[in-house]
């Protein structure tokens, strides 16, 4: 499957508004509240540059979810899943494997986001496995527990 770049026709103001919405969503996620600016630059901004994201709002224009994806090589995917390293700008279009760096759905819309991605974004990849690393905050020990998750498109 060939990946073509389709830049979004978004204004700088629209992108800034969505980034602000992602920050608002992160306030409701124990994991994302812990991110530092460098992590946001690494894990969110490339998606806006490459139009590899979905941003969801409710009927009142309030943000409810965000998801982005990268097309990585098998080697990079395996390194990301093992925790050897984090995603870098050159990774986002390095292969054919779909990797989800971030899904922020703190109000319970995760399943709806996945179903939307299956129908609207990833239909050409139907049957392919997609992976992500979910984090859960262990506040008692002040650490994040990594959990690899796979699902089918």
From Swiss-Prot:
<dbReference type="GO" id="GO:0016746">
    <property type="term" value="F:acyltransferase activity"/>
</dbReference>
<dbReference type="GO" id="GO:0031640">
    <property type="term" value="P:killing of cells of another organism"/>
</dbReference>
<protein>
    <recommendedName>
        <fullName>Lysine-acyltransferase RtxC</fullName>
        <ecNumber>2.3.1.-</ecNumber>
    </recommendedName>
</protein>
<keyword id="KW-0204">Cytolysis</keyword>
<feature type="active site">
    <location>
        <position position="32"/>
    </location>
</feature>
<dbReference type="Pfam" id="PF02794">
    <property type="entry name" value="HlyC"/>
</dbReference>
<dbReference type="InterPro" id="IPR003996">
    <property type="entry name" value="RTX_toxin-activating_protC_bac"/>
</dbReference>
<keyword id="KW-0963">Cytoplasm</keyword>
<comment type="similarity">
    <text>Belongs to the RTX toxin acyltransferase family.</text>
</comment>
<keyword id="KW-0808">Transferase</keyword>
<dbReference type="GO" id="GO:0005737">
    <property type="term" value="C:cytoplasm"/>
</dbReference>
<dbReference type="GO" id="GO:0009404">
    <property type="term" value="P:toxin metabolic process"/>
</dbReference>
<comment type="function">
    <text>Catalyzes fatty acylation of the protoxin (RtxA) at internal lysine residues, thereby converting it to the active toxin.</text>
</comment>
<keyword id="KW-0012">Acyltransferase</keyword>
